[in-house]
Amino acid sequence: MSLCIGNFDKSILPNSIVEAVTVPQKMYGVKFDGVNSAGVRTYDAARFVWEPSTATKAGKDSFLGIPMFTPRECITEYDTVEGKQKVVAYKGDNGYDTLKASKTGDVMMEFTRFYYYRPSETEWILSPEYIFGFKPAPAFYRDGKLLDKVYVGKYNLGIGYVSQSGVETLSNVDMNTIRTNLRSKGMYMWDLKWWETLKMLCLVKYANCDVQACNSAGYNSGDRTYPSGNADNVRGLDGSNTSIATNEACLTFGIENAYGNVWKFMDGVFCNDYYLYFKEVSEITNDPTSVADLSVYDKMANNIAVGGNNAELKTLTFNTDYDYITAPQTFGDGPYNDYYWGQSGLRECLVGGDAWLGGSGGLFVFAVHRAVGIADVNYGSGVMWY
């Protein structure tokens, strides 16, 4: 071993190594106190500002232009030769508006990989690059592979199993049927990996864990299956047509009605007696029909909140093996203003709430009280592919 004394000549190193050790790595964080809904942005996000947009005014958005915070709207179609979805056009391309208006393909939001570190229940730090101790955001690590992009439906899954503007939301269909129809076109239902990834982005950008109070109340009363496209005129990635408090369609990172409207089935996760069981969505063809079927699933070591049916959630799970999961840990008065439903037995997982939930919907509302195989007019799905 040789000893280097004095100034080190960096010219002998490859440019990639020099850049890695000399360019500060970006980190965008947020920290909450566990009592108040509003948090404090940290690191490179400390001086950032954000306000939701409306149909007449673009909001303030310091995050705009940073790839991980700026998903791209695009249209994708199923390639029958290669057996997978492909991007055919991005918003802004010539002919894009014509394709969208003619309901060609599916309208998706293209999200870019990032990494996260969650030091505690109430703190998140995100980075576009790998930093020691950080992990890939869960949506971007699947089947043992690191993904550059994930494509998420801009709209709730509509009748005809599409993500398109001006289509009635699909509901009253069970998970097996939805899963089968989406697989035939190279797509998946939303899963908890994606939902938790979206939460991370929202928490840092909004610096608030009550999205109905800071972004939009969304559809929180009335018809649960409004047609899609009612937020198409919002002049930004987040917000709603008129105001935060109005009962109307909303955008969250370009996704319409990510919460409210209809409950969203979560694939890849099931609950039994308050324990969560996980499996890659690519490996699931049918719902488990008995507890014995869960033997091939991974199990989170600690249980989520026991009981508490129709109760406000107070604290979130913080499990070192599944530190991206933010399921209810305890219930009572808390900063999230979201509700939790839980019952023992084999249950499906639903998130987001529906148009009947009022001010109790949002990113953290969580339900594991309905039996596997349920179909309900209040239940629908999101769509994604990778």
What is the predicted function of each stretch?
Residues 1-20:
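Short, low-complexity N-terminal tether/leader segments at secretion or assembly junctions of large
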Residues 26, 30-32, 196, 217-235, ...:
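C-terminal, surface-exposed recognition/capping segments
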Residues 50-55, 107-144, 301-304, 314-348:
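Carbohydrate-recognition beta-sandwich/jelly-roll modules
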Residues 114-116, 156-158, 194, 269-270, ...:
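Acidic glycine-/aspartate-rich tracts in secreted/extracellular proteins
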